[in-house]
């Protein structure tokens, strides 16, 4: 029992994520956005990666939204930084029940790495958002990562659980603060990553 427990939860780390994003509605229902982020690991002492997300989202109706995003990112693999390119395709469903909003997102993620495997994942995320007060919302989410072109007995590779708050500072500026617990699964020595993430988002009229 103790051996199994430490094999599952003994390998842990802590990191911090910070990001600034800008978005604008270019036509009715179509938004474009840019998001710059930095992420640390090794107990938040090492810069693990930084990247820029450039994307667009289209609101089909009040229930469905689609999106596409391109992410050039620099990753630190201990011997230096390497450039990777990542592409996302999203389909998100939303159901609003008074002050509670329910979300289900399916994301296809593919990464281009020079001289390496180009992994493709499907990510399924469930999210519940609750309005607490004017401009203040709380949320809880859980996301599952499936390696579509991987090998092994199971394609389920990672879980990302999170909870946090969103606060509208003004009509144009929003802040978010959240905790994430990212756990590798179906691996001999899985890593559990604990993350505190802070984000600022500005909407251009």
State where each predicted segment sits.
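Transmembrane beta-strands of outer-membrane beta-barrel pores
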Residues: 36-42, 70-76, 95-99, 108-112, ...
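Outer-membrane beta-barrel domain signature
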Residues: 7-11, 40-45, 76-82, 112-117, ...
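Predominantly the C-terminal beta-signal and adjacent terminal strand-loop region
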Residues: 140, 151-152, 156-205
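Start-of-domain marker
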Residues: 8-67, 76
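Residues that define the transmembrane beta-barrel architecture of outer-membrane proteins
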Residues: 14-16, 48-50, 83-87, 118-124, ...
């Amino acid at each position: 029992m103790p051996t199994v427990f430490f094999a599952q939860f003994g390998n842990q780390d802590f990191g911090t994520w910070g990001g600034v994003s800008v978005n604008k509605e270019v036509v009715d229902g179509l938004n474009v956005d840019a998001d710059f982020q930095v992420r640390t690991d090794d107990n938040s002492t090492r810069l693990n990666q930084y990247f820029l997300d450039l994307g667009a989202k289209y609101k089909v109706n009040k229930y469905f939204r689609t999106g596409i995003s391109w992410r050039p990112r620099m990753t630190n693999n201990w011997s230096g930084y390497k450039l990777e390119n990542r592409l996302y395709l999203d389909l998100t469903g939303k159901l609003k029940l008074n002050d509670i909003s329910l979300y289900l997102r399916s994301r296809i993620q593919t990464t281009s790495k020079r001289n390496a495997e180009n992994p493709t994942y499907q990510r399924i995320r469930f999210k519940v958002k609750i309005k607490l007060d004017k401009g203040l919302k709380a949320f809880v989410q859980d996301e599952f990562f499936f390696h579509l072109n991987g090998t092994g007995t199971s394609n389920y590779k990672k879980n990302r659980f999170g909870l946090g708050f969103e606060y509208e500072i003004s009509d144009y500026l929003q802040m978010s603060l959240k905790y994430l617990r990212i756990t590798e699964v179906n691996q001999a020595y899985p890593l559990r990553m604990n993350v505190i993430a802070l984000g600022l988002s500005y909407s251009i009229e």
